[in-house]
Amino acid sequence: MSFASEMKNELTRIETDLCCSKAELAALIRMNGNLNIQNMQWVINVQSENAAIARRVYSLTKKIFGVDIELLVRKKMKLKKNNVYICRIKMKTKEILDELSILQDGQFVQHIDQSLIKEECCKRSYLRGAFLAGGSVNNPETSSYHLEIFSLYESHSEGLTEMMNGYGLNAKTLERKKGYISYLKEAEKISDFLSIIGGYQALLKFEDVRIVRDMRNSVNRLVNCETANLNKTIGAAMRQVENIRLIDEEIGIDELPERLREIARLRVQHQDISLKELGEMVSTGVISKSGVNHRLRKIDEIAEKLRNGEHIELKK
């Protein structure tokens, strides 16, 4: 079972008060429901590929409105051929749609009615219902961090985004081919969202994976940094040795001033040690890393002049 499916199964087991149940059911029916006419009466069909979500719709509708509901199972004929679960509501359909602010004055409402989310707990419940109906979240173990909720209507998606940002989640709205999404890309904000909608077990798993991933990434960055520094050090040492050998071939190392001559010989003899270690080997006393670097730069300048055929004056 995917991380998103496990999370949704957890969310469907949350106990809620009547006002919160209404808010959650409103999101579920608005986003997963459709209205048909059968035998001269309205019928609401709420469809999901997740059996736990279908049971949630059934139990919330029964709890709030006390009506009988048909549960149907269909087999998808395309792609994975998953089961499709349908909650069919034939009784009190107009009352239900009116009560959940999906239908007002005979017109379908595309935005989120504020009467549903007056209380803080109801806002969280509406977001939970919206995620159950149209939400997805990447597996934190294998993918980049991403959580989204799909809406058919722009005004509804913007309402979700605004509600999420009421909790400081930095959510964004984006148009997709067949609708709109409200999405989060930051791991910390996804964790906050899971907490807001009551997905505490999913939150713990997400945080565990996130900690391991962040630690692994930190180690990789450190290794890469150390490797880059090592390669830089090796490259500099090879260049220095090459320049010293050029000087030796052209004019002889013995022609260098004493302070450069000793460093040149030490570098050729100890090509794999650091500048700090070179400075500790000088016979006249320890010199600093910057002091060693200054002398090696002087040697580099002399070698470059020799390559260019320039005149060199060496002070003993």
Swiss-Prot record:
Keywords: Cell cycle, Cell division, DNA-binding
Keyword Repeat: no
GO BP term, pick one: cell division
Pfam families named among the record's database cross-references: HTH_WhiA, LAGLIDADG_WhiA, WhiA_N
UniProt keyword Cell division, yes or no: yes
GO terms of molecular function: DNA binding
Domain of life: Bacteria
DNA-binding region(s) from the entry: 274-308
InterPro entries per UniProt: Homing_endonucl, Sporu_reg_WhiA_N_dom, Sporulation_regulator_WhiA, Sporulation_regulator_WhiA_C, WhiA_LAGLIDADG_dom
PANTHER family in UniProt: CELL DIVISION PROTEIN WHIA-RELATED
Function of the molecule: Involved in cell division and chromosome segregation.
Family of the protein in this entry: Belongs to the WhiA family.
Protein name: Probable cell division protein WhiA
Name of the gene encoding the protein in the UniProt record: whiA
